[in-house]
Amino acid sequence: MRSTLLAFALAVALPAAHTSAAEVPLPQLRAYTVDASWLQPMAPLQIADHTWQIGTEDLTALLVQTPDGAVLLDGGMPQMASHLLDNMKARGVTPRDLRLILLSHAHADHAGPVAELKRRTGAKVAANAESAVLLARGGSDDLHFGDGITYPPANADRIVMDGEVITVGGIVFTAHFMAGHTPGSTAWTWTDTRNGKPVRIAYADSLSAPGYQLQGNPRYPHLIEDYRRSFATVRALPCDVLLTPHPGASNWDYAAGARAGAKALTCKAYADAAEQKFDGQLAKETAGAR
């Protein structure tokens, strides 16, 4: 039952990444289990001159290195903290160097290790009000999944508004609210370089609605309207490179190494595909209600 709940809660019908025989997967939690690829360690993968994927083969955690310290966007599952710190060390980043943690949303597979990372590094967390509330509850009383996918709670240190910017070491991170998958879902954009040339990176949150009641949802009455706005928001992002919390959603394959982003989607293609799937889910729900 617990596995089934998590499958509805977090899995978004993505292709599993290939696992590596050289790396032993991180252990499953006792409370619930996830696909093994979500726990498959990987070495840091370079996305741009200062941006690295340091999570697992099927969960994104982005490290952005600046002259004034590092920024982490998402952390994956609760048991990933030590793996992330090891990958930071491989990039020359000490625990004290981690200054800021940003979130796509506050589900267990993206905010799971935040409490431990804060304790071990002293990093501050910035999130919008909706994500901050869910983070402080450790994912409990989720709008769709109740207490099925909890994790150690943590407090946000800074509440951000839509369009707000945070600058670390000359790199400007902009928050773009894209409510839907959760009310606090957020895309983050910044400009890095590749071989000295500017590249605009968009880290856009999930646009899936796995098992959600879309119409007449008593806990989220404006869900459909929020999703529609978020599809438009993602299409309009400054976006030379798109990454997503679950890499398969944007056609990244982290296990492919240097060719990991060879088939990556544009922001427009990502939003278009997600909206088409959403419309199909909505039509099926409507038909079932007749």
From Swiss-Prot:
Substrate binds at residue 205. Its main location: periplasm. It is found in: Periplasm. Residues 1-21 form the signal peptide. Residues 22-33 form a propeptide. One of its GO terms (biological process) is response to antibiotic. Zn(2+) 1 binds at residues 105, 107, 181. Belongs to the metallo-beta-lactamase superfamily. Class-B beta-lactamase family. This is Metallo-beta-lactamase L1 type 3.
